[in-house]
């Protein structure tokens, strides 16, 4: 059993070394290897998953035209991403969904701005009222002390004591 393991390990090492030596001498393949590997991976995945994806898409979409349109748009988007483009092709259905989502976000932002504006206006009004209360005017006389003094004297006064003094002489 150990001999079989060592044979497999040496075989893997030899294949690895042969592959690396081939790539070392071929500069073009080495330079574009990540790009070629990604293309081969996408092609292999599309080949393996093509039929099942087509069947599922046809049952969901309902018509063959929509399926073909979705597949073509997806392929173009994959190709554009491979070449480094940030833009993507969007179908009409997705475009309508994106537009409605954007409009909903704009409406939410407008509501938030209105609430914040209302709060700010209330705060400004409150600050103006506080300023008016704190502002001292010389022509106005503050009667609160006198009023409070009168009320204090009434409260301290004994209700059972006669209001005027009567002399007994």
Curated annotation (Swiss-Prot):
Name of protein: Non-structural glycoprotein 4
Higher taxonomy: Viruses, Riboviria, Orthornavirae, Duplornaviricota, Resentoviricetes
InterPro entries associated with the record: Rotavirus_NSP4 (IPR002107)
Species assigned in the record: Rotavirus A (strain RVA/Turkey/Ireland/Ty-1/1978/G7P[17]) (RV-A)
Side of membrane Cytoplasmic, spans: 52-169
Membrane topology annotation: Single-pass type III membrane protein
UniProt note: domains: Binds 1 calcium ion per tetramer.
GO BP term, pick one: monoatomic ion transmembrane transport
Intervals, Lumenal compartment: 1-28
Gene Ontology molecular function terms on file: channel activity; metal ion binding; toxin activity
GO cellular component, one term: membrane
Record keyword Metal-binding present: yes
A matching Pfam family: Rota_NSP4
Role, per record: Plays an essential role in the virus replication cycle by acting as a viroporin. Creates a pore in the host endoplasmic reticulum and as a consequence releases Ca(2+) in the cytoplasm of infected cell. In turn, high levels of cytoplasmic calcium trigger membrane trafficking and transport of viral ER-associated proteins to viroplasms, sites of viral genome replication and immature particle assembly.
Post-translational changes noted in the entry: The N-glycosyl content is primarily Man(9)GlcNAc, with a small amount of Man(8)GlcNAc.
Assembly notes: Homotetramer. Interacts with the immature particle in the viroplasm. Interacts with host CAV1, early and late in infection. Interacts with host integrin ITGA1/ITGB1 heterodimer. Interacts with host integrin ITGA2/ITGB1 heterodimer. Interaction with microtubules blocks trafficking to the Golgi apparatus.
Family recorded in the similarity comment: Belongs to the rotavirus NSP4 family.
Alphabetical keyword list: Activation of host autophagy by virus, Calcium, Enterotoxin, Glycoprotein, Host endoplasmic reticulum, Host membrane, Host-virus interaction, Ion channel, Ion transport, Membrane, Metal-binding, Secreted, Signal-anchor, Toxin, Transmembrane, Transmembrane helix, Transport, Viral ion channel, Virulence
């Amino acid at each position: 059993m150990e001999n079989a393991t060592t044979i497999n390990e040496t075989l893997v090492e030899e294949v690895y070394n042969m592959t690396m030596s081939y790539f070392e001498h071929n500069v073009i393949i080495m330079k574009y290897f990540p790009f070629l590997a990604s293309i081969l991976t996408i092609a292999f995945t599309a080949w393996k998953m093509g039929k099942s994806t087509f069947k599922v898409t046809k049952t969901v979409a309902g018509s063959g035209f929509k399926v073909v349109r979705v597949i073509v748009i997806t392929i173009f988007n994959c190709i554009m991403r491979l070449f480094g483009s940030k833009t993507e092709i969007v179908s009409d259905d997705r475009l309508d969904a994106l537009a409605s989502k954007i409009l909903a976000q704009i409406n939410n932002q407008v509501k938030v701005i209105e609430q914040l504006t209302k709060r700010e206006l209330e705060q400004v009004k409150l600050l103006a009222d506080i300023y008016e209360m704190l502002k001292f005017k010389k022509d106005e006389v503050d009667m609160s002390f006198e009023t409070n003094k009168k009320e204090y004297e009434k409260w301290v006064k004994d209700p059972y004591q006669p209001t005027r003094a009567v002399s007994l002489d």
